[in-house]
Amino acid sequence: MSDRLKERKRTPVSHKVIEKRRRDRINRCLNELGKTVPMALAKQSSGKLEKAEILEMTVQYLRALHSADFPRGREKELLAEFANYFHYGYHECMKNLVHYLTTVERMETKDTKYARILAFLQSKARLGAEPTFPPLSLPEPDFSYQLHAASPEFPGHSPGEATMFPQGATPGSFPWPPGAARSPALPYLSSATVPLPSPAQQHSPFLAPMQGLDRHYLNLIGHGHPNGLNLHTPQHPPVL
């Protein structure tokens, strides 16, 4: 009798564990799909995608890949462009953090805590700078920032900020996301802006075929224009 009671108690627990593992596997796979399918990756900037949306985009993308006139090999270029977005965003976040540390927290470059934070961010940036795809004639990202005092190029900014800004750039120099105005800045963020290069200078050599790929893929899945899925052509200078 006691053995039967023990068996009954074990069964619900085992079922819950199995069910949890199954849900975890499903969620893990859906997260991977969201990072793999280009259109799902592009839409994640506007908020979290529903599971059904990710599955629908995956089906549409696979259909487009298997269509006879899909331009083979271009998907790598599309994913490389998304990698560019990531590197640029990481660089922008690093600049804002340094601006916060030096203006709000009043840290100096000689502070141990400041140096440790910056060294950690730089180490992660170098790891992320490794090319994921074959070279596409793009300038190599340079994350080798050095701790140094502020130079005349950065009037009005603290010494720590000069460590993060490329030549001629200041905090908040570049709009993000590309093609859209920056959201209202936090009190510690500068609103200074600099002119962006002309469109011909902004576009990397492979953007022309990329635009054709976007239009072809979106036409196949029933969207007439790339902006229908919030997929904007990058309007920012190359990652420095």
Swiss-Prot record:
Function: Transcriptional repressor which binds preferentially to the canonical E box sequence 5'-CACGCG-3'. Required for the development of GABAergic neurons.
UniProt xrefs under PROSITE patterns: BHLH, ORANGE
bHLH domain mapped to chain residues: 10-65
Organism: Mus musculus
An individual GO BP term: positive regulation of transcription by RNA polymerase II
The protein's name in its UniProt record: Hairy and enhancer of split-related protein HELT
Family from the record: Belongs to the HEY family.
Molecular function in Gene Ontology: DNA binding; DNA-binding transcription factor activity; DNA-binding transcription repressor activity, RNA polymerase II-specific; identical protein binding; protein dimerization activity; RNA polymerase II cis-regulatory region sequence-specific DNA binding
A GO cellular-component term linked to this record: nucleus
UniProt note on tissues of expression: Expressed in heart and testis.
Domain Orange: 86-121
